[in-house]
């Protein structure tokens, strides 16, 4: 989920103030926490441009931790804290205050100078200006205290990893969610799983759970193939310390520095793994034909049964969705399935085999164990609301509790993968730190994307939100949950209060009724609260545990419970991510923000205009649903920090701004019908106020760019796509909530489809694909109105009906029109399709449109004039208006 306004990120390194902070994977130079080695070798990361603007704030704490040497028995300090240098922070806050004063003075001036000749438009614009000021303030105040926290991975290793190769790190369950192998290409999902299995985390301490919410045998068989390939891929990653550990992304990189321990074997191993991966992809693609052929063969052998079943490789009927849907075997109506693909490994390293004819890669010095891998397809039956992604993750929560019950959980969408193998360790640093670790419900990592066009035309990276706003929230109660790449504390998801509000740790389960009637699950809750315990070996899948797993996945399990309300991920809202994070914050938990270099996780994003707008529509509609629900941040949550409440009000109410913004964007139509552009007099004073307010906003933005590590293009794209969203989808989101308030259905939200480019030449093919949809037309109208307004203004100026003062006022109005067109420029490129590869064509078309409309306006004015006629002679000449002076 993303919101308007700025964004923020934590991470990176700082060389200022003697803190010696590191960038993600590096240790800090100022010593460590309790029990750390004072003489530990420091590995400094490459300094990024933004790091010089940050200084440490925890030097006294770190010095005290080093001095006691861990003798106090407390956990170490596992992250460093930084704030923006005063040379930037003080001007940033001062500019914010000055702009606020300017907005207040502007509003007072407007109230004292009503425009009698256009009171209707004046009142609308005054209300709009007031709302713009309020929404800006709501967005800005959350960024006045940005904080960066940088994990100390070296100290974590010193404290928890043992010399014999074992580790005392806590257990971690990783959730992956997917639905459709077509709209969500399976190669993405399987790469995500491979990167999780190969992550730099104790093998016996983390497990991976794939939730297939479509119950597709394609995913099941694909996971079997992935488990086989992982036996080669994961040891290869460990032997050569490669990054990233998703093979599709790894092999796409032409070259990178070698960091492994066997350089003499690397080239041959690399070639062999590349061949194996290509064959693996062929096998995955072949499943779409192999499974139907296999099923046809079995169906012919069982023709007397009269059904066209889908068959598994072992000759049993697939209990999930069939290729030819049948009763009890179709989407929305099938049995639950759970299958352990890779068993839980032993807690002792297991070395592989030396190179041989069958396997030319030498793994004799490599631990070849693999983490536990589980396939889940929950039960679905007619008459039950399955609650989409939130419902699937709640089933994962219960099933994993019965099998591994790790105290920490991290969730991914099916198209995201682990880009930095140490990312899991980074999140654990925040969870185990002795300062706020126990009260931290989740650690949010920023979203980063592959295959986005170089100019990021549709602001997919959303850097202003992820690298500024979330960094600001990090200084309050913590960032919001954005749906993927987030590490949770299991008991926090269960609705348990944080320790600061729960002095009695023994009273974790206050009511079994809210969790359901499964005793084994309820008994697992207090066990999960022990965050430093290891994953115990899961029970054997005997009849009793299989029945418990079946009960946990049953549709009726949640009836009469608090699942989807105060337990697990929240239901009945399009943005279950934001409201789930809000539920945790309002009960007193805090969150942390972690940015690493290289990026912790990466994924795919829609680069097609229509798909991107549908994504924004779902986010904005869900935001308003939250605002008008019992989770409204305006009222809910007595434990919510006041500034955090303001941030959530902004994140949920921002689409309302589009109502007034759309009025301003369509206001230039007055050029056409009235020939004036006044909503306030004296007009020059009005424009002067606007220039001051806008200039102050841009100045604030330039300072924000510095401390957040953004680029000017990031800032421009954020402004452009906010205007595009405000014209195309935010009004639909407002309409959606109005309809729902009247008990009607509301607007349907379309899930974003992901596609795999088949060749390098088609890498950005979706960018140039025009998918016409109704939500495109409001922005097209705004473009047309502003082009017509500029053309009409030119026509009126040439016709000679304006005084010099009127032309001066008109020129100020034209600046507004041109500014609108520049902001909507990416949208205009999007609807041009492949013509947008030559952007100059757009400018030529716009200029031609200006000329045509100006000539048309001149002709209309001339024909309406009582003393002047405009007509053409056969010879091709023309009689021009007398006011032109010819």
Curated annotation (Swiss-Prot):
GO terms for molecular function: cellulose synthase (UDP-forming) activity. The keyword Hydrolase does not apply. Keywords: Cell wall biogenesis/degradation, Glycosyltransferase, Golgi apparatus, Membrane, Transferase, Transmembrane, Transmembrane helix. It is a multi-pass membrane protein. GO terms for biological process: cell wall organization; cellulose biosynthetic process; plant-type primary cell wall biogenesis. May catalyze both beta-1,3 and beta-1,4 glycosidic linkage on beta-D-glucan. Essential for (1,3;1,4)-beta-D-glucans synthesis in grasses and cereals (Poaceae). The mixed-linked glucans (which are not present in walls of dicotyledons or most other monocotyledonous plants) are particularly important constituents of the walls of the starchy endosperm and aleurone cells of cereal grains such as oats, wheat, rice and barley. They can account for up to 70% by weight of the wall. The chain crosses the membrane at residues 87-107, 118-138, 659-679, 683-703, 723-743, 775-795, 812-832, 840-860. InterPro entries: Cellulose_synth, Nucleotide-diphossugar_trans. Substrate binds at residues 413, 415. Belongs to the glycosyltransferase 2 family. Plant cellulose synthase-like F subfamily. It is found in: Golgi apparatus membrane. The active site is at 213, 577. GO terms for cellular component: Golgi membrane; plasma membrane. Its EC number is 2.4.1.-. It comes from Oryza sativa subsp. japonica. This is Probable mixed-linked glucan synthase 8.
